[in-house]
Amino acid sequence: MSIVALLIGLGPLIGWGFFPTVASKFGGKPVHQIIGATVGTLIFAIILAVVTSSGFPTGTNLLFALLSGAGWGFGQIITFKAFELIGSSRAMPVTTAFQLLGASLWGVFALGNWPGIGHKIIGFTALVVILIGARMTVWSERKEASNAKNLRRAVVLLLIGEFGYWLYSAAPQATSIDGLTAFLPQAMGMVIVAVIYGFMNMKSENPFRNKITWLQIISGFFFAFGALTYLISAQPNMNGLATGFILSQTSVVLATLTGIYFLKQHKTSKEMVITIIGLVLILVAASVTVFIK
């Protein structure tokens, strides 16, 4: 692995690692966050399309790319709602675990991954380890009923949001276009969902006139940067799909730690140790699910 490939492979660490923290730092409600983040992603995607002169898909390729982006928009709205309940540092490991489970199960039952009994035993064991790791990251020494209630609500929300993230990753597999070509229509699908959600919230306020909404465009740049560098990293002449995926998953570590330290989402020393162990379990188990394909 060259230095250039490694640096590009760590791009998602920066983009996706800081995205939830930046979005939470700017504040606002989920409606402000999703509109700003998706507009930022769309701006990034338009600039990329112009610079690279990548084509624009048509027909079913366009439809599935739009559905992919719409899925992400739905999933991210739900995730922002979970941030309100338990904070980004607790929500990110859980949603990452659910996304890994969703992608892995789709790969097994729809794409024929993990052939053979041995591979399936190892794979499903790794998925159990991922769930254990996620549970460890949200463990708390404080047993207040309100904390437990918020955690349960957040987990249910994140589980629902996983259907959107699953669509984000699965829909492009039904197309014949590459990631760079799909990037712009995906961003368009994200914005469509965000705008619809914005109009659904018009009774309480006009989110399109709130300055926080447009400040959140910066958070969208972080997400888009992570997505772009992942697409490049996964190319065979760079890190390849397996290594690129594993490097991208390190973003959950940065997202969790920056949430704790930058957003002051406090953890006790014991909680911190258990959280780090949980993150390591998630990363190791995620690596296993990739290499047994």
Curated annotation (Swiss-Prot):
Major localization class: membrane
Highest classification ranks of the organism: Bacteria, Bacillati, Bacillota, Bacilli, Bacillales
Membrane topology: Multi-pass membrane protein
Highest taxon of source: Bacteria
Xref: Pfam families: Sugar_transport
Keyword Transmembrane on entry: yes
UniProt xrefs under InterPro entries: Sugar_transport
Lipid biosynthesis as UniProt keyword: no
Record key words, sorted: Cell membrane, Membrane, Sugar transport, Transmembrane, Transmembrane helix, Transport
Function summary: Could be involved in the uptake of ribose.
Family: Belongs to the GRP transporter (TC 2.A.7.5) family.
Entry's transmembrane regions: 2-24, 34-56, 63-80, 95-117, 122-139, 154-171, 180-202, 212-234, 241-263, 273-292
GO CC, alphabetical: plasma membrane
A molecular function GO annotation: carbohydrate transmembrane transporter activity
Subcellular location(s) per record: Cell membrane
The protein's name: Putative ribose uptake protein RbsU
Gene: rbsU
